[in-house]
């Protein structure tokens, strides 16, 4: 359910990738706005470039693409909205849909800086992100 689109030859260790339920209450308490709209995806990727794009596959999304926001946990344990220029929601073939359908597989591509705001890992050349969609 996760891969590195810029480095398809590099496999993500699925033992270091998790999908968990994030309750609406916890989402709001931690700083999310609106409704939680998917799984909390926590992913660790080793031996990365200074800036790495991570792609997360997901289904069950419906509504207008522009209504969705991506939130990421920071080291302070709070959710922060990820800037639109750092992520996109697309189909598997790279198209940006206007409307989402629950039975279609989508990909969230998020760019993370090693050691940046949304990198939860203190290890150099390793990123750990925890992201969730809201709408």
For each feature predicted by the language model, list its residue ranges.
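Extracellular/luminal ectodomains and secreted, surface-exposed scaffolds of diverse proteins
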Residues: 80-101
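Proteolytic processing hotspots in large secreted/extracellular or virion-associated proteins
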Residues: 24-75
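Generic beta-strand hydrophobic packing signal
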Residues: 43, 68-70, 85-87, 92, ...
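Ser/Thr-rich low-complexity repeats and stalk/linker segments
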Residues: 34-38, 45-47, 66, 78-80, ...
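Generic "edge-of-domain/loop-turn" microfeature
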Residues: 9, 19, 48-50, 63, ...
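C-terminal beta-strand-rich structural cap/linker in extracellular carbohydrate-active enzymes
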Residues: 95-135
């Amino acid at each position: 359910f996760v891969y590195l689109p810029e480095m398809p030859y590099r496999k993500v260790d699925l033992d270091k990738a998790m999908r968990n339920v994030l309750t609406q209450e916890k989402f709001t308490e931690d700083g999310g706005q609106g409704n939680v709209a998917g799984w909390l995806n926590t992913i660790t990727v080793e031996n990365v470039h200074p800036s790495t794009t991570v792609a997360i596959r997901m289904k069950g999304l419906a509504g207008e693409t522009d209504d969705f926001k991506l939130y990421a946990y920071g080291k302070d344990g709070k959710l922060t909205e990820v800037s639109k220029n750092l992520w996109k929601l697309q189909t598997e073939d790279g198209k940006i849909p206007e409307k989402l359908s629950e039975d279609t597989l989508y990909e969230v591509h998020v760019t993370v800086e090693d050691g940046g705001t949304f990198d939860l890992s203190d290890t150099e050349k390793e990123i750990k992100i925890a992201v969730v969609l809201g709408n």
